[in-house]
């Protein structure tokens, strides 16, 4: 326990919290190249084949990123834009690929939440 005089001299240090998206190096997004595109199964109560990709970022870190939406055109060597955001039922997946930017196409026939999936407005 410090004395009052020690606190006057030195003060208290703020604790530094852990960054959840370390590979982005404090950027909102980062560009990367897909090294492997595959499917994986989620944790216990859920059942599906979730689409994910291993991506080597421009920060020289390789991460696993989730491909949101139905259907995708990604393959090895595709250029993608990656943002933070984990997938709760996939352990180790802490990043998501942004649809509709670089080599990633938007989701076809998407009516709601279009901006999240890079889908253009349909002509009526």
From Swiss-Prot:
Molecular function, one GO term: tRNA binding
Xref: InterPro entries: NA-bd_OB-fold, Ribosomal_uS12, Ribosomal_uS12_bac
Gene Ontology CC: small ribosomal subunit
Region (Disordered): 105-124
Biological process terms in GO annotation: translation
Matches recorded under CDD domains: Ribosomal_S12
Biased composition regions of type Basic residues, renumbered to the chain: 108-118
Disulfide-linked positions: none
Residues recorded as bearing 3-methylthioaspartic acid in the entry: 89
Recorded family membership: Belongs to the universal ribosomal protein uS12 family.
Name of the featured protein: Small ribosomal subunit protein uS12
Gene name of this polypeptide: rpsL
């Amino acid at each position: 326990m410090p004395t009052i005089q020690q606190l006057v001299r030195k003060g208290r240090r703020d604790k530094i919290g852990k960054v959840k998206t370390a590979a982005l190096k404090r950027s909102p997004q980062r560009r990367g190249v897909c090294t492997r595109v595959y499917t994986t199964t989620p944790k216990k109560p859920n059942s599906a084949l979730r689409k994910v990709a291993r991506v080597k970022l421009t920060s020289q870190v390789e991460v696993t990123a989730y491909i949101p939406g139905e259907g995708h055109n990604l393959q090895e060597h595709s250029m993608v834009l990656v943002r933070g955001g984990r997938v709760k039922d996939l352990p180790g997946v802490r990043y998501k690929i942004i649809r509709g930017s670089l080599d990633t196409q938007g989701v076809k026939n998407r009516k709601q939440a279009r901006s999240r999936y890079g889908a253009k407005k349909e002509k009526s």
